[in-house]
């Protein structure tokens, strides 16, 4: 989950309202987010990670939307961990649904996996799911870039909030929704 707190000094006598989420033509599925338009070969942060043989073998048995516990894995490929049926471990994206949460933590099969190809997503593909433009360059090691992307708030999501803040200060009306929290 992402929580965003907007605070405005009381002496300004302005009231921020939560902007109504834009629901244009439904949602964008993760396949379209990653593939449309195609990522250029020389695009920054689009380096593929080498997968181990066991990871590739495991991924061959995991269908889109499944993870290491919900897939029908052969005994020799099952993980030796108890519980965690709702885990993100070795979870493949479902190409027809929005992406699940992109996280900045890592290791142990939590890299976000392609729906068809037996591999983790590149950092550029992860960045696209967070709605970063392809010309935005992340700096640092692959793991550092992965953390930056996972810790980010999706660009398109924060854009609506920033526009609402600007309209609040300009005293321009905008469509809003009621908060599900009590006034603090």
Predicted features by range, described:
Residues 1-52, 56:
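Flexible, glycine-/basic-rich loop-and-beta segments that form/coincide
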Residues 46-184:
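C-terminal target-recognition/interaction regions appended to catalytic cores
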